Each structure stands twice: as structure tokens, then as C-alpha cells.
């Protein structure tokens, strides 16, 4: 494990190093919540945990700055638990193994947790610092952002006192975000009665892996391969041409991550197994050709394994309906933002497919900065899966964050950034969900901006943070806090 705690600025890296030692996958936050409360007590920082699982910290103003506007520093404590197929990492119990790789910090075949651990580490650095000049400061460290923004959604009104919100969950240094997409979770389910497999049939497990995957918002515009969408094209052809039957399907594991791996078990007449192997080889060539220049095609694996024939499989009519619905389901960019060239407005991610044992579940995350188009896309999905006889439910909906280009904090941040870096910052809206929109719904008076150091490939085992961005990010934070105006 690389010793990252001595990297500069030590104030942030020391705290991030501590966070890597505490397991904090979404949905399993007891250890990190306890750690943050213990840390705050030891540091002499006022802190408490609210009913939604958020940790709130408070630090009084530097003497003489009590009349300044209050600043809320906000980040989320949970991390996406993704790992390479060969990794045995246990996210609920194991620390993250960090590696210094040139100008980057990464993990050993797992997500790093810099999303949003660096934001949390920055809050800790501000809270414990003795030499910073600032007005009243609060830290809001939210729970389970990655799986539905549950902490932000459960944030009580009246809990926070500040006037300005600095969200620390943007992943390109020098970009200052003033708008983000809304989102909605779509879940289609079906219970079915399995049928007996033909005892004379063979069974083959087909695996597709080695795709990049990635963040289903930030990286959806790159046209990366979705393992579920690639797999359904093969499965439909195998059913049509080789009399194959679907026994099970497992693809993807996070709504907000583009699936990089999918696996199906098919049964088919023994005399067709060789043809199936040839078909898989042909589809591998096709995928590599289609995604050459987008995917690392040398990493793509598409292969078969002979397995014991399962006792049951999906009934033919239900199988055909499911496969057709998955095939027809939209995935990727639906529309670009008309008013912001190069920015995705509306997209969806066919994230998780689980079929087998008499149950089918398909999970999708749709995003849009346009509320009407978000619901249009969600209803499109509902119609698609209703035709397959599935029950469709919407959950976890949150609105977009509408940009305010005349924001006072935006003007202030851009001024400080240019003074320190000698160039203009880039004002952006992002095609990803930020908690800002939800918090603004509860605290509409807040002046909000989001920024942070550069991270690459969040939500994947290739996640990494650029070391050289963290020092200028910290310098901006220190000057910004010292110059917050009076109320």
C-alpha cells in the first residue's frame, strides 16, 4: 500500500488516507459514520448524525469574521464498490489498497473512493485547521449518495444555517459546475414458473467481460459498450438460429455504472454447441470492430464454458418477451442539450439484469436536465417492459439543478481561480446527479457551486485521482473561505 498521507497538501491527503482504511460501500455506512463522529470528537469539532444518516459538523468563525456569510461544505461519505473480476476485495471489511502511479493515486483493482472521499477529506481538513481564516462553516457529509441520494433526500429542513453551499463532488479541476441532471430509477420485475429443461440438451455459460464500464452520467457520451446490450444481441441470435433457451442472466451490479460484464447460461441441442462457440467468436469480432477506438479491445473477452445442464429454464414465450424488451430498451444518449453544445441532456443506462430461479429484474437509471424528457424516457421504458408482461416501478426521482450564471459565489470562485492559476475557469453543467438540486429544494436561499480535483474513471476499478490538482484545489478553498463577504 502506497504511503499517500505524505503527499501535498498533507492536510487533505492525511485525511483521505484515513478514509481508505474505513470500509464505506453504499448501504454499509455504520463504520464510516462511527469513524467520522469519533474523529470529530477527538479533533474538538461539533458533530452529530441526523435521522437520515448524514454527519453534520460545525466550526465557529475565526474571531472578527462572525458577520460573514455561512458556508456549507458538502460531500458524500459512501463509495461505489466496483472491482476487477479477479479481485477478492471485500468492500464491507477490507481497507482500500492505494497505489501512487506517477501523477495519479489509484487502487489495486478496485474503486479508489476518491469519489467522494477527497471531498470528505477536505471537509475534515477545514474543520481541524487552526490557521484558516473563515466565517461560520458547516460540513454536511451525506449518506448513500451513490444508490439514490438517500441522505440528501432525508435531510431535515432547518438543520443547516449557512448561506453558501460548496459541493465538492465535481471531477475535473478547473471546471465549476452550476447545473446538473435529474434522475429516476426504473425497475421492471416479473415472476414466472420455470419449465423443465430437455434432458438431452447441453448447457453453456457465455461470459462477456473486459469492457471499460464507467460512470453512467459523466461517461455516457463516449459511446462505451454496455455489456447487457451487447449480450442481448448475441442471445437473440442464438435463440433464433440454434434453438437455444435461456436459463439465467446476470449483468451489471450498480445502477449508476455502465455494466462491463454480463453472463448467461443457455441450453441447446448438443449438436449445436460447436455452432454456438463459433457464433460467440463471431460476436466477439463484431464487438471489437464496433467499439474499436472507444473500448480497449485487447481486454475484451467473450467466451463459452460447458456447464452442468440446469434442471429448469425460462419458458419460451416469457424468454422471447424478455429478450425482445431488453433488445428494444433504449440505452445511452437520447438527446443533447439544445442550449449547451456538447452537453448531454437525456440518457439511460441499462444497468442490471437478473434472470433465473423464476424471477426477472431489470434496473435502469434515466437522467435528464429536462423534467419532461426525464419522464418521457421513463414512460418509454415502462411501455417497453409492460409489453413483456413486467411490473414497472419508478423510484428515487430527483430534479435537475437549474444553472444560475449570475451567482455571486460563481463570480467569486472564478475570480480566485484566475488570480491563482492565471487562466479562466470553465463554467459547466454536468450530465450526472448532484445532491445540490435536492438540497436546494429544502434550502432554496442557498447560493451553490460544485468543484473539485480531477478524477478519472469513477465507479470503475480504474478510478484514479490526479495528485497535482489537489494542491491548487486546496489553495482555492483556503482563499475562498477567507474572502467570503459579510451578510
Could you say what each language-model-derived stretch is?
Residues 23, 103-106, 146-147, 153-367:
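Midchain, well-structured core segments that form catalytic/ion-binding scaffolds
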Residues 219, 226-229, 233-249, 403-446:
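Active-site-adjacent substrate-binding region
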Residues 65-147, 152-163, 189, 203, ...:
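Active-site metal-coordination/substrate-binding segment of hydrolases
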Residues 4, 8-12, 338-341, 345-360, ...:
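Zn-dependent metallopeptidase/amidohydrolase metal-coordination segment
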Residues 158, 223-241, 268-273, 320-327, ...:
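His/Asp/Glu-rich mid-to-C-terminal helical/loop segments that flank catalytic regions of hydrolases
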Residues 255-263, 309-317, 402-415, 438-442:
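Short glycine/threonine-rich loop-to-helix capping motif typified by GTGT followed
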Residues 343-432:
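Substrate-recognition/cap regions that form aromatic- and gly/pro-loop-enriched pockets
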Residues 3-103:
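Acidic/His- and Gly-rich active-site-bordering loop/insert found
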